[in-house]
């Protein structure tokens, strides 16, 4: 029996029907049997504050960190707000990285998908997330890069991926499965 890797999917949009959440769901459906993708919610995480960490960390922080620690890999799916990372995603990254020296992210293979209505597909957010991941010691898949622009055009009226988008995301998630296997062995 082959290894099944658990992948925490962190979506940087809080909207229930955001394009990013739709792409995350589609990736879950397209994932090969070696990956089990699960969206980890970030909307209930209080803003990170080291004073609170020292006094009594919120249960939501503990639960989030535990979910990340239990995962074998992490997939970030993010929109772009003002050419950068949405505040909720940056907060989740910060919460998972603390207390200092006890990061839940360390060593976890990762990849970033950015989804935007704009033409450049969230390029700024994608790279801002990657910059944090380098510091957090997360081996990040470099290719294929995933900048999905024109988000409304990625889906059919039914909400499913269209025939133009599906092959790219299939290739992406297949490559990510190989990346996870390669980097979890290290």
Curated annotation (Swiss-Prot):
Family, similarity comment: Belongs to the SsuE family.
Function per UniProt: Catalyzes the reduction of quinones. Acts by simultaneous two-electron transfer, avoiding formation of highly reactive semiquinone intermediates and producing quinols that promote tolerance of H(2)O(2). Quinone reduction is probably the primary biological role of ChrR. Can also reduce toxic chromate to insoluble and less toxic Cr(3+). Catalyzes the transfer of three electrons to Cr(6+) producing Cr(3+) and one electron to molecular oxygen. This reaction produces transiently a minimal amount of the toxic Cr(5+) species and reactive oxygen species (ROS).
Protein name (record): Quinone reductase
Regulation affecting activity: May be inhibited by divalent cations.
UniProt keyword annotation of Manganese present: no
Lineage: Bacteria, Pseudomonadati, Pseudomonadota, Gammaproteobacteria, Pseudomonadales
Temperature effects on activity: Optimum temperature is 70 degrees Celsius for chromate reductase activity.
Subunit-structure text: Homotetramer. Dimer of dimers. The tetrameric configuration has a central role in chromate reductase activity.
Phenotype of null mutants: Cells lacking this gene are inhibited by chromate to a greater extent than the wild-type.
Top-level taxon of origin: Bacteria
Pfam families: FMN_red (PF03358)
EC number(s) given by UniProt: 1.6.5.2, 1.6.-.-
pH dependence: Optimum pH is 5 for chromate reductase activity.
Cellular component, GO annotation: cytosol
Keywords: Flavoprotein, FMN, NAD, NADP, Oxidoreductase
Cofactor note text: Binds 1 FMN per subunit.
Organism: Pseudomonas putida (strain ATCC 47054 / DSM 6125 / CFBP 8728 / NCIMB 11950 / KT2440)
SUPFAM superfamilies reported for this sequence: Flavoproteins (SSF52218)
Induction: Induced by H(2)O(2). Induced by both chromate and the stationary phase.
Classification via InterPro entries: Flavoprotein-like_sf (IPR029039), FMN_Rdtase-like_dom (IPR005025), NAD(P)H-dep_reductase (IPR050712)
Gene Ontology terms for molecular function: FMN binding; NADH:ubiquinone reductase (non-electrogenic) activity; NADPH dehydrogenase (quinone) activity
Cofactor(s) needed: FMN
Residues binding FMN, per UniProt: 13-20, 80-83, 116
Gene3D superfamilies found in the cross-reference section: 3.40.50.360
């Amino acid at each position: 029996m082959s290894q099944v890797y658990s992948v925490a999917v962190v979506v940087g949009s809080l909207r229930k029907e955001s394009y990013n959440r739709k792409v995350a769901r589609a990736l879950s459906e397209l994932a090969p049997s070696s990956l089990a993708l699960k969206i980890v919610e970030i909307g209930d995480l209080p803003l990170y504050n080291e004073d609170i960490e020292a006094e009594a960390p919120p249960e939501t922080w503990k639960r989030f960190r535990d979910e990340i620690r239990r995962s074998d890999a992490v997939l970030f799916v993010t929109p772009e707000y003002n050419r950068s990372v949405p505040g909720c995603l940056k907060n989740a990254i910060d919460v998972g990285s603390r207390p200092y020296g006890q990061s839940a992210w360390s060593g976890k293979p990762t990849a970033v998908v950015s989804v935007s209505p704009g033409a450049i597909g969230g390029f700024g957010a994608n790279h801002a997330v990657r910059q944090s991941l380098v510091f957090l010691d997360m081996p990040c898949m470099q290719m294929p890069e995933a900048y999905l622009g024109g988000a409304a055009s990625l889906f059919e009226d039914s909400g499913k991926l269209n025939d133009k988008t599906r092959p790219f995301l299939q290739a992406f998630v297949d490559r990510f499965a190989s990346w996870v296997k390669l980097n979890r062995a290290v």
